[in-house]
Amino acid sequence: MPKFVELWVYLSATPLFGLTATLVVYVLAQAAYARLDQAPWANPVLWSVLTIAGGLMATDISYPTYFAGAQFIHFLLGPAVVALAWPLWERRDVLRQRWGALLLAALAGGFAASASALALGWAFDLPHDVVLSLAPKSVTAPVAMGIADKIGGIPALAAVFAVVTGMVAALSGKYLFDTLKVPTDAPGWMARGFALGTAGHGIGAARALQVNANAGAFAGLALGLQVLLASLLIPLAFRIF
């Protein structure tokens, strides 16, 4: 038996498979992303997800088998989000001056994201629990799952909607901002980043951080505000209405 096949058989039967597959695929996707001058359509998260999902389907490996190893990377999502606070700390003077406008923008953006998703769900006559799963689509996936569970949605589906939303934001953000002629000076990067973090949570924030430090800092702020506001207001709104 060729050594590669022996290695594949060994890895696919152990938790090392998910960890190894995720790291290898992402490193290759990141290298391609760099070679393509960080083109939005070459987003490494998008192509990593598509490659791994296609590989699991082609090899008939179950998701629990894959996640047994990938969970070690999943654990790092929390520290990675917390690390976004450092660029914000470096810009604390700007935050003090604009906290009111930023909070209002976060409220408006979060409301628009949830309301538009619910309206589309009802317009297409989707099942009620699917519609509820759309409400937290612009919040990072673990939080979206918790919110969906509280309001009667499907947590796993909410996570899928959140990831897809983040990818769409990361892919389309630059083109939309350029079309709207959002400037690329310091205030413009702040606005771009805040919008990406509001609409695309962690995936959008990661894209913003790759492009500009100011954009990344304010995307991280928007991500945190959306987590806080959505966790409080979405369950409250469904309880009232």
Annotate each predicted stretch with a short phrase.
Residues 90-167:
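Internal active-site segments that recognize and position negatively charged phosphoryl groups
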Residues 18-31, 49, 53, 57, ...:
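Transmembrane alpha-helical segments of multi-pass membrane transport proteins and ion-pumping complexes
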Residues 6-22, 29-89, 94, 100-101, ...:
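Helical membrane-embedded segments and adjacent short helical loop/helix-boundary regions
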Residues 130-157, 161-164, 186-225:
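Alpha-helical membrane segments and immediately flanking helix-loop junctions
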Residues 16-20, 24, 43-46, 168, ...:
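Short, contiguous, pocket-lining structural segments
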